[in-house]
């Protein structure tokens, strides 16, 4: 890395394990400065509950970034709306969570931060606070005014991107259009090159129907939509293999020769990835004008403040973001 970069972190739901995980991140050195967008008292109290040392350094945007030393975090303060009891949701803190996301996103857009790593949020309590919220991905897409974003989950061995995300199953076939596939594959291909440093990405593409339609006998979306799009993009030089049946695609003979998989819908691709790498997975938002990675688990309210939360996914998300920063420099 040419110079030390700043990475901004949002711990997520304050009553969940996000603050625990951020405190655990501080128990080692990092080659980047970790700027945590959070309430100071929340982090200090949670560190005390866990019996871990923590010193908060003030965020100084006009000073050069410094590698993070053991036992420290850099604090970008955002005040809680209500005091926090570990494991107990407070509706007003839905506003606090969104404020941390907005400040972190804006800091990435204005060049303060080289990447954003997000902890788990509780969508229900944010909506109960009167804030329409479907997820991090959609929030950052709207706030950054990105034309289109793509959700990809990854472990060290497997990357799975989604053509559609949080849609009811009955709506998916209608959503798989030529325009959508062109857009999603273009973003996936571009970000594999620019953010992952893969010169000529090799992408496996799932069919939509069982057996990838069985030649039109089990649905015609492959013939009518997916194959024509793939043929057009192959003619432009993209290395695309598919459409392949999803029940056979996830085998070494295919995966060993691929850099990513494009699944048509959420539950087609993610169960395999989460089984293969549960606790080590990372959620990446492609198509944003900045790097964003996230843990692939929830708030685990029952574990908050107990010292039993696994920091593995957060570490993987941070390490991946650092690699992506290097690739984009």
Swiss-Prot record:
Disulfide bonds: none annotated. It is found in: Cytoplasm. One of its GO terms (cellular component) is cytoplasm. Pathway: Cofactor biosynthesis; pyridoxine 5'-phosphate biosynthesis; pyridoxine 5'-phosphate from D-erythrose 4-phosphate: step 4/5. The keyword Protein biosynthesis does not apply. Substrate binds at residues 136-137, 274, 283, 292. Keywords: Cobalt, Cytoplasm, Magnesium, Metal-binding, NAD, NADP, Oxidoreductase, Pyridoxine biosynthesis, Zinc. Its cofactor is Zn(2+); Mg(2+); Co(2+). GO terms for molecular function: 4-hydroxythreonine-4-phosphate dehydrogenase activity; cobalt ion binding; magnesium ion binding; NAD binding; zinc ion binding. A divalent metal cation binds at residues 166, 211, 266. It comes from the Bacteria. It catalyses: 4-(phosphooxy)-L-threonine + NAD(+) = 3-amino-2-oxopropyl phosphate + CO2 + NADH. Binds 1 divalent metal cation per subunit. Can use ions such as Zn(2+), Mg(2+) or Co(2+). The active site is located at the dimer interface. Catalyzes the NAD(P)-dependent oxidation of 4-(phosphooxy)-L-threonine (HTP) into 2-amino-3-oxo-4-(phosphooxy)butyric acid which spontaneously decarboxylates to form 3-amino-2-oxopropyl phosphate (AHAP). Belongs to the PdxA family. This is 4-hydroxythreonine-4-phosphate dehydrogenase. It comes from Escherichia coli (strain 55989 / EAEC).
